[in-house]
Amino acid sequence: MATTPVQPPVSNSPPVTSPPPPLNNATSPATPPPVTSPLPPSAPPPNRAPPPPPPVTTSPPPVANGAPPPPLPKPPESSSPPPQPVIPSPPPSTSPPPQPVIPSPPPSASPPPALVPPLPSSPPPPASVPPPRPSPSPPILVRSPPPSVRPIQSPPPPPSDRPTQSPPPPSPPSPPSERPTQSPPSPPSERPTQSPPPPSPPSPPSDRPSQSPPPPPEDTKPQPPRRSPNSPPPTFSSPPRSPPEILVPGSNNPSQNNPTLRPPLDAPNSTNNSGIGTGAVVGISVAVALVVFTLFGIFVWCLRKREKRLSAVSGGDVTPSPMSSTARSDSAFFRMQSSAPVGASKRSGSYQSQSGGLGNSKALFSYEELVKATNGFSQENLLGEGGFGCVYKGILPDGRVVAVKQLKIGGGQGDREFKAEVETLSRIHHRHLVSIVGHCISGDRRLLIYDYVSNNDLYFHLHGEKSVLDWATRVKIAAGAARGLAYLHEDCHPRIIHRDIKSSNILLEDNFDARVSDFGLARLALDCNTHITTRVIGTFGYMAPEYASSGKLTEKSDVFSFGVVLLELITGRKPVDTSQPLGDESLVEWARPLISHAIETEEFDSLADPKLGGNYVESEMFRMIEAAGACVRHLATKRPRMGQIVRAFESLAAEDLTNGMRLGESEVFNSAQQSAEIRLFRRMAFGSQNYSTDFFSHSSYNSRDANV
């Protein structure tokens, strides 16, 4: 009697608690015993098992020949659709492929514990024997250590009906894996089955051995199997968290049903890792390029800064002219000639010139060079001698004329301190100041180098045998010296107190512009002789009275000394004249009562220099006497600042701004409407004729109103 085998439906739902119904009393020819997996049946494991990295496939259980069981009842889960029964077909043509790994629904949706779904049917009895009592076959689970966080469950493939009497087909080999993958054995049956089981699908390669499908994951939802008698079921991929390879059956022929391996899920990860590596390499390359460009920019910036520093010393081109000298002068007769900056070098204990920068310039000179330039510091080259040392005229190898000052400060001060102080002073530049352009340190010797000034100093022109200075020149010299001192006191950083203002330290240009020299030398002497408390800084006749009582020099001390210089310009007398009668040797003490009388009566003949012959401007003489009287006051707090003295001299020149016209006697000429040149300028400057016309008209009306 022929039987029509019916393939049981595949269930991807959790285990069914109710036993399957009894099988039909159909008989089938005897078949060899089923081929089972090597593992013996094992008891059901606990509900939860750690998920393996790949989905695990199990060998299907044997089914009865010719006695297909009826379809199982509908699973209780609502999330999984019920399996559809397979229409029976002739045994030779029916070869259902093994079912791929299918995730099962979460345990929350199934009332029984989350286990691998049991086999759809229990093993049927032999032919012509009533089916045994229905009993649910226990599910077979094989545990496997999970590599991922969430568990993955893969149900076993459905049983297939093979009523043929041929021996069972061989099972296709499994892909290679690090450890053998064990398939769960078929469930035990009371009676042996007589139909060969279908080939068990191979398990995918995995890093760890997969022994059984674990309990269902929490977030995985089951998908309904698509069963077809002649086509293999679709392959479902495991959850994204696991990295297994998924088997895809090739055809419905068991002998040619070689599984197709999909690439593992961690392939994208390797691609991402490769992409990340490439990005990191690109980022590192860009960073290295930026660092190289930054270093190159810093190098170029340093070179440009060095060039600017060297070129900052250069100035106007002034050709020195021959000069006459006197031993009475305490300063060199030099001037700034900045056509060539200076560089430096050191050799054999002394600083040697170093060609560099522009025009082989140098700021540090060797002692041998200065000896050669001054002809061995001969008396023929001596320009003057004062409290700080002797001044010699010298000619450098490049033809420049310089003044070399030998300081009498000894070697008490360290080289670093002296060099730092000189560098600070050499940075001071003003049109009414003489700056230091070089220095030399050789053992205990200290030398300063200035450019040569050709027109001597104020002391020489006032008290020498040359022609008499006219009044206008004297006013010009006084105003220039006041500006230079005001710069040192108020605008220079750090502020500098000269400490030795006198007529011999006011050098004159060829056009009689005044330039104050030797500023800062008193401080150098004090720094080098701090242990000497009896040294007197300054010159008798110029020193302020508070210095004699306290020994303290302040800015007001310089103001007092400048007042003495003003008295020299007014009277033509020396600060201390021993040829005068007793009690009149001091210029300040002699001039005090005369200053008060001249301010009250505006009679200046008693104070004015007889050499002038009365050729002076009375208003300027009055202003000059007034300024001198304020500077030589006894109390330092009553003396004006140098800035106030400068403004007093500027007011002398401000009187010429009116050009002989008085306020209110003139009318502003409106040239905006009558001069063609002004109209052209207006169009070029403003672009709009109406706007510029209103502007000029408004200014003209305001000027007229102000005059009225």
From Swiss-Prot:
Uppermost EC category: transferase
Protein name: Proline-rich receptor-like protein kinase PERK9
Residue spans, topological domain Extracellular: 1-280
Gene for this chain: PERK9
Ranges where the record places region Disordered: 1-272
Phylogenetic placement of the source organism: Eukaryota, Viridiplantae, Streptophyta, Embryophyta, Tracheophyta
EC nos: 2.7.11.1
Family the entry assigns: Belongs to the protein kinase superfamily. Ser/Thr protein kinase family.
Active site residues of this protein: 500 (proton acceptor)
Native species: Arabidopsis thaliana
GO BP terms, alphabetized: cellular response to hypoxia
